[in-house]
């Protein structure tokens, strides 16, 4: 099922019993977090708070609170279908040369479809039905959540930030949290390696002292939102990828005050600039690790204009100790990652990011081992192949007889197939999430790889143990008489 905009998605979710309208007043200050957290942990529906205390704009929460709703948002009928999206991305990331004319002809429709999904720019857009400018701009009109009691201020969480570097042909989409610090100012918390920060740095180098145009879309359609957090190849824009997911071209509109193009059906658009050198201390905030992060300095985004649909919906979330929405997103997107990794490393049989590992800080890989040192090659490949795993602190590699998604299996492999000294790989001075206060230096820390595979000659001089396997014939005989044994 495909969705043309957020409202269409909300309507379809409600028809499926996957969305609940909350018609009593609930405050965006702490209360919505509590309601959403309980609902997410119970694998409950998306929530539309129709009467946020003190506001006229409804709040949509827990939208991607189950892997199934993430899959729906990406146009898939089930989580398992996300593997097909991963296969498409793997092909687009590194397309294989055709083996012949027939093979080339079979691949032609894919490239035709990609070309056909180039974004469509329109003039009259729903997101510009209402325009607020100048001194009338006031972010206090938005029911921005204060998620935790120790949070310093309200926090915009699902803003889709649109930027464009001076030397780039296409725009960058990124989701960065934004602390509200005034009527028309927020702090843009983007890390130095993220696309928005790179665009800003290039702008400052080419246009020193000049304001950097930025736009933020709130409440875009689900395909566009999820496209921004998916490992899309550099050769494919997030807008075009969203079109592939939606099976229809993404409609864009030029902003009123800059040349950036934003989703035409988004609920709310913030337009403005970042003045080079204008910085502010951001935080502390409770984040996806389950802790409050330390205060750090980031650029200030000045909002010059707000445009929105008539009767807009404000899309929001919270982050905290897993499970939270980012963790659920990680569970679903895990299925997209597997084919991409397998394209580069065919020996990988499964890849799993445990949600309790904060979505990306730990990975478990199962593989068909073929030679001594093979597991170490795979773990180094995981760290280096996709940008999404540059912050993964722990990689556990096991044989393919282990279920990567069953901790009983994984712990058994670690404790029976590993020597702590021989089979542990430590790498120092690597990129680490700035939110990781356990690292000795902000943004720089170590990584650990655990080789929990069977050891080959050359890796050990000892006779390796054989796994105990039950006798199939005996198992079948006992199955046949089990009910007669009277064992409950």
Curated annotation (Swiss-Prot):
Its main location: membrane. Prenylated FMN binds at residues 175-177, 189-191, 194-195. One of its GO terms (biological process) is ubiquinone biosynthetic process. Mn(2+) binds at residues 172, 238. It catalyses: a 4-hydroxy-3-(all-trans-polyprenyl)benzoate + H(+) = a 2-(all-trans-polyprenyl)phenol + CO2. Its cofactor is prenylated FMN; Mn(2+). SUPFAM superfamilies: FMN-binding split barrel (SSF50475), UbiD C-terminal domain-like (SSF143968). GO terms for molecular function: 3-octaprenyl-4-hydroxybenzoate carboxy-lyase activity; metal ion binding. Catalyzes the decarboxylation of 3-octaprenyl-4-hydroxy benzoate to 2-octaprenylphenol, an intermediate step in ubiquinone biosynthesis. HAMAP family: UbiD. PANTHER family: 3-OCTAPRENYL-4-HYDROXYBENZOATE CARBOXY-LYASE-RELATED, FERULIC ACID DECARBOXYLASE 1. Homohexamer. This is 3-octaprenyl-4-hydroxybenzoate carboxy-lyase. It comes from Pseudomonas fluorescens (strain Pf0-1). The lineage of its organism: Bacteria, Pseudomonadati, Pseudomonadota, Gammaproteobacteria, Pseudomonadales. The gene is ubiD.
């Amino acid at each position: 099922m495909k969705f043309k905009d957020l409202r269409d998605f909300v309507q379809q979710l409600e028809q499926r019993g996957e969305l609940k309208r909350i018609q009593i007043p609930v405050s965006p200050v702490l209360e919505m977090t509590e309601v959403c957290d309980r609902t997410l942990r119970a694998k409950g529906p998306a929530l539309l708070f129709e009467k946020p205390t003190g506001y006229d704009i409804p709040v949509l929460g827990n939208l991607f609170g189950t892997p199934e709703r993430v899959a729906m948002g990406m146009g898939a009928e089930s989580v398992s279908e996300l593997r097909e999206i991963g296969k498409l991305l793997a092909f687009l990331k590194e397309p294989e040369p055709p083996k012949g004319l027939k093979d080339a002809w079979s691949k032609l429709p894919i490239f035709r479809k990609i070309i056909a999904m180039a974004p469509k720019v329109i003039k009259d857009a729903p997101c510009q039905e209402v325009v607020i400018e100048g001194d009338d701009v006031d972010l206090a009109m938005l029911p921005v959540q204060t998620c935790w009691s120790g949070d310093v201020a309200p926090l915009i969480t699902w803003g889709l930030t649109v930027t464009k570097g001076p030397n780039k042909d296409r725009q960058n989409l990124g989701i960065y949290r934004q602390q509200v610090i005034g009527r028309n100012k927020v702090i843009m918390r983007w890390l130095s390696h993220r696309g928005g920060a790179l665009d800003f740095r290039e702008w400052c180098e080419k246009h020193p002292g000049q304001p950097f145009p930025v736009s933020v879309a709130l409440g875009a359609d689900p395909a566009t939102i999820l496209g921004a957090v998916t490992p899309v190849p550099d050769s494919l824009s997030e807008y075009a990828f969203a079109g592939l997911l939606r099976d229809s071209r993404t409609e864009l509109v030029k902003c009123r005050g800059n040349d950036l193009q934003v989703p035409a059906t988004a609920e709310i658009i913030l337009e403005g600039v970042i003045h080079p050198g204008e910085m502010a201390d951001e935080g502390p905030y409770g984040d996806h690790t389950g802790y409050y992060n330390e205060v750090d300095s980031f650029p200030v985004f000045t909002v010059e204009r707000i445009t929105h649909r008539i009767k807009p919906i404000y899309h929001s979330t919270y982050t905290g100790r897993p499970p939270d929405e980012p963790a659920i997103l990680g569970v679903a997107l895990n299925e997209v990652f597997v084919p991409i990794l397998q394209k580069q490393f065919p020996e990988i049989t499964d890849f799993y990011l445990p949600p309790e590992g904060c979505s990306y800080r730990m990975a478990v890989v199962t593989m068909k081992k073929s030679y001594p040192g093979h597991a170490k090659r795979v773990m180094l490949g995981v760290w280096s192949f996709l940008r999404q795993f540059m912050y993964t602190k722990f990689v556990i590699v096991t044989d393919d007889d282990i279920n990567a998604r069953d901790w009983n299996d994984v712990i058994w492999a670690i404790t029976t197939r590993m020597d702590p000294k021989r089979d542990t790989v430590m790498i120092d001075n690597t990129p680490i999430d700035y939110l990781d206060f356990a690292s000795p230096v902000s943004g720089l820390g170590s990584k650990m790889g655990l080789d929990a595979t069977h050891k080959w000659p050359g890796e050990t001089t000892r006779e390796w143990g054989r796994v105990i396997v039950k006798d199939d014939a005996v198992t079948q005989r006992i199955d046949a008489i089990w009910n007669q044994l009277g064992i409950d």
